[in-house]
Amino acid sequence: MPRWTREQIRSARMAPLPPLLSQRGLQTIALPAGNLELTGYKGLIVKDSYWRWPNQNKAGNTIDFFVQVLGLSFHQAMRQIIGSS
């Protein structure tokens, strides 16, 4: 498995979620204040590189989303977010 640098991990944590969700075919509904609700995940709110899902008592950054919501491993998440370069 690849070793990720601190900078790559920091960059992945701060990667904007909306374009990554679109790439995966996930749809969102616009809400006030720049928030988006992820369709199919009732109550899951996304804004920039942060998300919160009060119904599930979960929240986090972009990496956390890929691991906790989509069920990927850390390495799979990193590959999805920044690629395998």
Summary of predicted features, one role per range:
Residues M1-S85:
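N-terminal structured subdomain of primase-like DNA metabolism proteins
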